[in-house]
Regions:
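Acidic-basic catalytic patches of nuclease active cores, encompassing PD-(D/E)XK
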Residues: 1-39
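Catalytic cores of nucleic-acid endonucleases
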Residues: 6-11, 30, 37, 57, ...
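Acidic active-site catalytic centers that drive phospho-/nucleotidyl reactions
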Residues: 20, 49, 62
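Non-catalytic C-terminal interaction segments of nucleic acid-processing enzymes
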Residues: 105-158
Length: 158
């Protein structure tokens, strides 16, 4: 049982790191600069994973990378922000003099989607409603079911 837990923890950590790489590329593609992975300086920075700027506005981003489908095969439609996300985001905004945002990266076996928005537009929700992102009711769609070209078996929750 312990080996299964270690393997699952490694899978989730790797999926998170993959998500951060996809997030950085998405930010570059959209003209953001001064992109910095905050986890490089101090592991598990509260709330934010990335910091960047565009048009003089500094933002911090919590990246949530998840499997598109849950183990039972249903759509994983809500990505939890974590405990006390708004309190941590507020502290991080003050620390970095930036505005808090989120990025949800949804990985399927052969495709990925990226959704992006400000924390304030979640209106206190404790999770990112990816189903509402897909319907264009919240956030922005940066990529939708775009093909990726890597073996996803390791990252799959099946």
């Amino acid at each position: 049982m312990e080996d299964i837990n270690k393997k699952e923890a490694a899978r989730k950590k790797s999926l998170g790191e993959l998500g951060e790489l996809f997030a950085i590329k998405a930010l570059v593609d959209r003209g953001y600069d001064r992109i910095r992975n905050l986890n490089d300086k101090s592991l598990n920075e509260p709330f934010a994973d990335l910091e960047c700027e565009k048009d003089g506005t500094k933002i911090i981003i919590s990246v949530k990378a998840r499997n598109k489908f849950e183990k039972k095969g249903t759509l994983n439609s809500r990505y939890n922000l974590g405990n006390n996300a708004y309190g941590k985001a507020y502290a991080s905004e003050k620390k970095h003099n930036a505005v808090a945002h989120w990025m949800a990266i949804q990985f399927g076996k052969t495709t990925f989607s990226i959704y992006f928005g400000s924390l304030s537009e979640l209106l206190g929700k404790k999770a990112i409603p990816v189903d509402l992102c897909e319907k264009k009711l919240i956030g922005e769609i940066w990529e939708h079911d775009k093909r990726h070209y890597f073996d996803f078996d390791f990252y799959s929750n099946k």
